């Protein structure tokens, strides 16, 4: 079939890839003649739509494959791009990696949700208080971060009943308000039930921070341990009943297991949200009568490593009796925290590099040691123990070999208690009290330890036994083996192993004497030293300004009472 067109002739069937031929129409055509009183019927509408389609869309210009977007399966780059979402294995792996990073400790995604959603909603609905709303009662205690009182409300509220604990703090008060609000939203069962905190500037002594908690009891773990009846004096209040066991090591071990489980659970809640307490000790652990559990208090020294609140490099806040030997929760080379979004985004990397949560684990290990060994519950004996442990390079096994042959009755009884069930308690204790922070067990891993199982090692399955063996292997100290390998590799550089020392090799090497420094060289060195000093000064100034800005932004979250 021949088709004649103004540009020439084409023999064959019309190509479906080319547009339909447009029929010329005159001005008198019924399509273009329009009168307001005449309506277009359905056939005219269809013809008009078809004409527009052929004019703008249906006109094919180019080769058929270009118009139809067909391609070659061999050369896949010529295939048309898919408009839909294509799921690939690398894409799925990348998405899972990103999600795991965002939810890794201390939690980037939960942190943004907590700061910009939960905190905002909480400020809208939480009750507010003023200093005049309280009737101050007896003084409960006084610490390094403030004075604590037992108070009641001057005007009863319908939804606020009972007694409260009020703390007046001047130093680190803003930090403690921030930490308690974070803990209340993320892990309320780990610490005391925080209600409200505000800044009072009306005092003549200067700005004062007031913090309010619900009253849950006055008993601390330190006070309970000082009793000669410990741990039996805790049995009824923590378990609700007396065990059907005679007084002895097995019954005491059950009570201590329960206390340790609650302490590790509270500590795991803090660490999961990025908070390091840095001052864990029996005096900062209270017993909540309502929940019948131990809770951690006094967050004035805590550091929020999710956004860098209260973290200052080369500065430490601790109690030397319970502090880990490294004294710092992060490497001293770690710089000051940047802005909050950047700090939160980088927090999982810094957490895995430093493992700051192991600092608190060492303190919990010493508390475990005090509960098992009655003679270590006094401050003087604890200080003496720390000195002995330091002389033993913080190796509990070496300390045991040192003191066990001439141990007192209390020490021997403590060793018998931790040796129950195949020594599983001693194994947990040695995994907590270690010199190197990276070799210590985490709070989450400690909760899964067989020590907290009722049947101990006998209740482990095959997979649990394999995991336990892997854990024991990874907790071993391979420093001696590493030193032996390094010494073997450096064999040629030691005179002891038949090689030459570095000094001897330098003497055997022929070399020209060093040139004396001239005036030009000295001037250049002085200029470089001055440049480094200027750069260091500018950097420190910028850090101070940055610290000031950081203090301003998170202080704005604290309510004020003028």
UniProtKB/Swiss-Prot annotation:
Quick one: effect of changing residue 167 to R/Q? Answer: Loss of function
Q: What is its EC class?
A: transferase
Sequence positions bearing Phosphoserine: 526
Q: Does the keyword Membrane apply?
A: yes
Q: Which domain of life is it from?
A: Eukaryota
PROSITE patterns (alphabetical)? PROTEIN_KINASE_ATP (PS00107), PROTEIN_KINASE_DOM (PS50011), PROTEIN_KINASE_ST (PS00108)
Q: Which Pfam families match?
A: Pkinase
Modification after translation: Phosphorylated.
Q: CDD domains from the xrefs?
A: STKc_SNT7_plant (cd14013)
Q: Tell me where in this chain the Protein kinase domain is found.
A: 134-452
Name of the protein:
Serine/threonine-protein kinase STN7, chloroplastic
- High-level lineage: Eukaryota, Viridiplantae, Streptophyta, Embryophyta, Tracheophyta
State the gene name recorded for this protein.
Answer: STN7
